[in-house]
A protein has these predicted regions:
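Dinucleotide-binding Rossmann-like beta1-alpha1 core, especially the glycine-rich loop
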Residues: 1-64, 195-197
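Short beta-strand and adjoining strand-loop segment in the mid-core
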Residues: 11-15, 79-85, 227-229
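Conserved hydrophobic/aromatic beta-strand scaffold that supports enzyme active sites
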Residues: 12, 126, 172-174, 197
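A general structural signal for well-ordered alpha-helical segments in protein cores
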Residues: 19-23, 41, 94, 148, ...
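Flavin (FAD/FMN) cofactor-binding core of flavoprotein oxidoreductases
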Residues: 42-53, 60-61, 167-168, 230-246
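Helical element adjacent to the flavin cofactor pocket in flavoenzyme catalytic cores
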Residues: 65-139, 143, 147
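Central helical "cap/lid" subdomain
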Residues: 131-188, 226
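Active-site lid/adjacent beta-loop-alpha segment flanking the redox-cofactor pocket in flavoenzymes
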Residues: 161-164, 178-246
Length: 246
């Protein structure tokens, strides 16, 4: 089967006085023809019955005694992007890309660790596999996800790149969705004021983080990391509950 793109629409909440922070985003969207609407507070409340537009920011951890307390500001506007959405099965999406590539002549070698990236005067010439096989090529694409920084180091280019990558661990929360979230059509919601995002996922609600400064970064070994639920799960759920308390 094919991975499905669910076009649920998306909304970004904006705290009063922070509208200028999104000017570049809106300019970029206009430049590529991506449609969007600017909403006021009453229009947000119509889309999300029961939502509170009180400001809680900047985001806080549960250990902060001021968590859940209002900070005096308000959410006064939002950006609505009708075409926003998600693909809920990234593994199936990757498999679709694999099959499409094979139909165009690509070959795949699994369980074939790379031991060396061949370079000559900072130009890649292929790779050497752990079993000694050499694959020569005019170019090498690093699409190794959380392992990409290691591959860059093997190629000797890590220190020359303007953009670096790290494997950062995140948790997302799955909760049974409140029916009110879907009665107007479940949407992607991004809330940097409270520090979370949420979106529908079937009959569930997925909640993640917007990476606020107070959380820090949990940089991990991409092959060995904690796969268990931690206090971050509870934190994300509580942050979302601030915005929809009823």
């Amino acid at each position: 089967g094919f991975a499905q793109y669910t076009e649920c629409g998306g909304i970004v909440l904006i705290r009063e006085g922070e509208e200028h922070l999104y000017e570049d985003n809106l300019s970029s969207m206009s430049a590529v023809g991506a449609e969007y609407e600017l909403l006021n507070a009453s229009e947000i409340e119509k889309l999300y019955p029961g939502i509170t537009l009180t400001s809680f920011g900047p985001p806080k951890t549960l250990a902060d005694e001021k968590f859940g307390q209002t900070s005096g500001g308000k959410i006064t506007s939002a950006i609505l992007v009708p075409a926003a959405g998600y693909v809920s099965d990234p593994q199936l999406a990757s498999h679709n890309l694999q099959m499409a590539a094979k139909n165009h002549g690509a070959d795949f070698m699994f369980n074939a660790p790379v031991s060396t990236v061949i370079t000559d005067k900072n130009v890649s010439g292929g790779v050497v596999l752990k079993n000694g096989d050499v694959i020569s090529s005019g170019s090498t694409i690093n699409a190794s996800g959380p392992h990409s920084s290691i591959i860059n180091q093997m190629a000797g280019i890590a220190d020359s790149l303007k953009i670096t990558t790290r494997a950062v661990r995140h948790e997302v929360v799955y909760l049974p969705a409140d029916a009110r979230h879907f009665q107007m059509g479940g949407r992607f919601l991004v809330d940097t004021d409270a520090g979370f995002y949420q979106r529908p996922d079937g009959a569930d609600l997925l909640i993640g983080t917007t990476d606020p400064e107070c959380d820090g970064m949990n940089v991990v070994n991409s092959d060995h990391y904690n796969a268990s639920v931690t206090e971050q799960w509870t934190l994300q759920a509580y942050r979302a509950a601030q915005r929809s308390p009823a």
